[in-house]
Amino acid sequence: MSAEYYFNLGNAYYRSGKKGKAILCYERALRLNPRYEKAQANLDFVNMKIIDRPEPEENILAVGFRNVQNAMSPTAWTVVAMAAFLLSIAGMAAYAFASAITLRKVGFFGGLGLLVVCVFANVFAARANNAATSHDYAVVMNDSTQLSAVSREPLNKDEVAFTLHEGAKLKKNDSIRIDGNVKNTWYKVQTADNREAWIKASAIEEI
């Protein structure tokens, strides 16, 4: 499926009142194409309409790092890393073998700088690839669901951790299948504000 397919499907779901499905589709579109501005704009819009609104990210450094990471695909970052590495070797070779002082200085500092570029490009490539292929995140599909403090249905109010609503995005950290029954799978999840609890698999859908 393409990012455009999920974008259009998300629009259709939103028009039919299914905000959770719409958010899921926009998230999938952005996983395939992190630079899809229309999908990001629509996701931000629908997120403003749900009960459990995600808080805006305030860490400027983290936002900038992610924006640079999303500037290119994992493949493109890998090409940049390889090119920077080869050029850094050429720079070091110039430093080692050139007779002119100026050329040696350019080779040394240029090679060192390109080596730093190589390291960062590899980091961006790995992170971008992980973002595109991982299945660690999910969206709540139920209108309302109680999360449990234990890895099963809460038996009393003391075992209810908190309640989430349709459209909330979660990170899956662990899972357990009770009695080997796939229909009784529970995920340990983390919310955007770092709360942790258990939720039944049937209440969420994987991005």
Where are these regions (language model features)?
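Membrane-embedded alpha-helical segments of integral membrane proteins
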Residues: D52, E57-F97
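Boundary regions of SH3-family modules and the immediately adjacent low-complexity/disordered segments
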Residues: K19, K105-T145, R152-E159, K171-N173, ...
